[in-house]
Amino acid sequence: MREYLNFLKYIKENGVLKGDRTGTGTRSIFGYQMRFDLQKGFPLVTTKKIHIPSVVHELLWFLSGSTNIKYLNDNNVRIWNEWATVDGELGPIYGKQWRDFNGQGIDQIADVIQMLKTNPNSRRILVSAWNPCVVPSEKISPQENVVKGNSALPPCHAMFQFYVANNKLSCMLTQRSADAFLGVPFNIASYSLLTHMVAQQCNLDVGEFIWSGGDCHIYNNHIEQVNEQLSREPLALPTLKILRKPNSIFDYKYEDFEFENYNHHPAIKAKISV
């Protein structure tokens, strides 16, 4: 994934120093796009190890509509723990907005599947996780926001749109805030996986995954790790194999996915900014 290394390098060389909500500080750029041909391999970063169970379980959790971390913790995924209440609640985050937007019974995922099957040329095949009604206040903690009925965090990956051409399904993700070192590799993998799943459900081949970022940043305490990653040579991409076709997009299990030939460099640890 040379595209991803070029992204890191561009931010490192062109980013401006900015403060941020966490107090860590960043090097930041505004506006960047990467394109991945899903016919040429699954875009899983190889210059460091990506924890595949976290990617898959988080996506299945989103699709379930759940906003409690119990499922994730039961599967040894703890990427959301810092923001949850003592009861494991995160408020109306991604899954809630995807499956029951604003609590009004609007299932955006089911609607997208139906539109792809019945009107694939539509330019309205999209899902938005951004709901201004529940955007949290920056003046109080994530947990306090949840108590007030808001989400613990606003969605970073805010909207995604599907596009069909030549019987191939492509997906474009718009990400308002992009943690380039820790977050973006997960986001690329997650939405590429979702594109494969939706394509299977709609009897389509996969096309491209397009990632578009707004505020793209490297945290100041990740610079050393970024330099380490940039020194590594990318390896061949793995291949995703989906072992069965469930009855619906909501019926996939972790065991349904196999990432063949995922060769990678060692993991690089970095502290997440809360």
Swiss-Prot record:
DUMP binds at residues 21, 123-124, 176-179, 187, 217-219. (6R)-5,10-methylene-5,6,7,8-tetrahydrofolate binds at residues 51, 179, 273. Its EC number is 2.1.1.45. GO terms for cellular component: cytosol. Its main location: cytoplasm. It is found in: Cytoplasm. Keywords: Cytoplasm, Methyltransferase, Nucleotide biosynthesis, Transferase. The active site is at 156 (nucleophile). GO terms for biological process: dTMP biosynthetic process; dTTP biosynthetic process; methylation. It catalyses: dUMP + (6R)-5,10-methylene-5,6,7,8-tetrahydrofolate = 7,8-dihydrofolate + dTMP. Pathway: Pyrimidine metabolism; dTTP biosynthesis. GO terms for molecular function: thymidylate synthase activity. Pfam families: Thymidylat_synt (PF00303). The keyword Transcription does not apply. It is an enzyme of class 2 (transferase). Homodimer. Belongs to the thymidylate synthase family. Bacterial-type ThyA subfamily. This is Thymidylate synthase. It comes from Francisella tularensis subsp. novicida (strain U112). The lineage of its organism: Bacteria, Pseudomonadati, Pseudomonadota, Gammaproteobacteria, Thiotrichales.
